[in-house]
Amino acid sequence: MYQAKKMLLLGSGELGKEVVIEAQRLGVVTVAVDSYEHAPAMQAAHKSYVIDMLDKAQVREVIEKEKPDLIVPEVEAIATDELLKLEEEGFHVIPNARAAKLTMDREGIRRLAAETLHLPTAGYEFANTYEEFKEAAETIGFPCVVKPLMSSSGKGQSVCRSASGLKSCWDMAMEGGRVKNGRVIVEEFIPFESEITLLTVRAANGTSFCAPIGHEQKDGDYIESWQPHHMTEQQIKEAKHIAKSITDELGGYGLFGVELFLTEDKVYFSEVSPRPHDTGLVTLVTQNLSEFALHVRAVLGFPIPEITQLSPGASRPLKAPKELADYAVEGLEKALAVKSTQVRVFGKPVTKVGRRMAVALSAAETVEEARERAAEALSHLSIT
């Protein structure tokens, strides 16, 4: 009988769904775990479990029961201390349990980047209470960026422009974090020209990079991404240096989403996630190997050949305007009539305000044209 490897995903969103599909293409048995039923990756996986992923006993129970060859965290909010123990007992966490723990919140990774590796970052302060937060904002100065230490898809992030906005920014951070009433980071506001994601792959045959992905954020969540993003040779050199430094320090195999700010004369490190990145959905139409295929190859220990850009492309996510228990994605016929365009509907069981429900992906001969096509496709889509 075929001796398949088994991969267990902790977190089963739309990015996890693509990872599951790529893993199955290489004969891997997949187990999808999340905190709610019918999550996107569960719809494609061989098996699924619903647990509280911040509960170490539940995480341990499902891992000991399934005995996976690979544990693949797909979100930040996991009982990472338990992953450290499981790793010591012989389980294989991707890329490793330390990286999962460091990137679980913004403090560990920011201190590592700025204080250990001395990479260029925005100035920052941390705060546990509203009083500390006010002091931190005064120290950093206005405008400043406020983020919960642990959140996903930009939830709870805001830009505070004056002292009068402090209370609302604090409340937003408290509400948006994965851990309610948690710690926050207050960052210097960098007047950047653009934000990019440099997808960085650590594999058996070394480190490789995808072409830079430009993206636009609104309320801390991405509303558009495109590839390639134009950068000078010097900017690309600096970006690769930062990405290699941070991913080498984290170690292990897999794809990392390294977020960077570009100013006229400098590249700043912002964040890193040791897994496929939402802005990287665009690679489904731009590259010979998508970010998901690259991640799966790397974590299985396979080499990564040359990553080829097949075409410029762009992505636009469809977000839910309100909460619905029953919903439909309308306008697919018109959206799919747009040239060189695909739509991926994620199949989430219910909508929430601002929740990503689908994505329009367009290719074209130029980035500008791809962005126009993706915008047109998105304009036809709605949730009812």
Swiss-Prot record:
Residue sites binding ATP per the record: R106, K147, S152, S153, G154, K155, G156, Q157, E187, E188, F189, I190, E195
Binding site for Mg(2+): E259, E271
UniProt entry tagged with the keyword Magnesium: yes
Disulfide linkage: none
Pathway listed: Purine metabolism; IMP biosynthesis via de novo pathway; N(2)-formyl-N(1)-(5-phospho-D-ribosyl)glycinamide from N(1)-(5-phospho-D-ribosyl)glycinamide (formate route): step 1/1
Residues annotated for N(1)-(5-phospho-beta-D-ribosyl)glycinamide binding in this entry: E14, L15, E74, D278, K348, R355, R356
EC number: 6.3.1.21
ATP-grasp domain mapped to chain residues: 111-300
Gene Ontology annotations for the cellular component aspect, listed alphabetically: cytosol
Name by which UniProt lists this protein: Formate-dependent phosphoribosylglycinamide formyltransferase
Organism: Bacillus velezensis (strain DSM 23117 / BGSC 10A6 / LMG 26770 / FZB42) (Bacillus amyloliquefaciens subsp. plantarum)
